[in-house]
């Protein structure tokens, strides 16, 4: 027996190639199955993109937190969307805030934040943060707890 609420999903349960770039990557959503407010966290410790100037690889640890309203993101589509940045040239700030803005556009969450903890290039780590506003009251919002980059120090 199949649940027709999920007929709109085109990636889950199928062999889906990695999209060429984030602009063409499909983010899929499903109806929020919960009535109570809650927070969902996605962690991508091996996010990659390319420097738009040199083409050198950039690496980040992403933490995405959101409080859903009517929709939740389907996790395989999120994984493929994030993977589509692998050969995409953009600065750290554009990647991090662009991911947050795309999720807001697709999901219309109560609240969302993303932390992009970028590994050093040229000796300088860059951390980029985006949020839609203050966290809602009555929902447990844990710290992202990603330590600052220390290298050998």
Curated annotation (Swiss-Prot):
SUPFAM superfamilies: Tetrahydrobiopterin biosynthesis enzymes-like (SSF55620)
The entry's keywords: Cytoplasm, NADP, Oxidoreductase, Queuosine biosynthesis
Catalytic activity: 7-aminomethyl-7-carbaguanine + 2 NADP(+) = 7-cyano-7-deazaguanine + 2 NADPH + 3 H(+)
Binding residues for substrate: 73-75, 92-93
Region (Disordered): 1-22
Pathway this chain belongs to: tRNA modification; tRNA-queuosine biosynthesis
Gene Ontology biological process: queuosine biosynthetic process; tRNA modification
Localization per Swiss-Prot or TrEMBL: Cytoplasm
Keyword Signal assigned: no
Pfam families: QueF (PF14489)
Gene3D superfamilies cross-referenced by the UniProt entry: 3.30.1130.10
A single cellular component GO annotation: cytoplasm
Molecular-function annotations in GO: preQ1 synthase activity
Protein family according to the UniProt entry: Belongs to the GTP cyclohydrolase I family. QueF type 1 subfamily.
Protein known as: NADPH-dependent 7-cyano-7-deazaguanine reductase
Organism name: Maricaulis maris (strain MCS10) (Caulobacter maris)
Annotated gene: queF
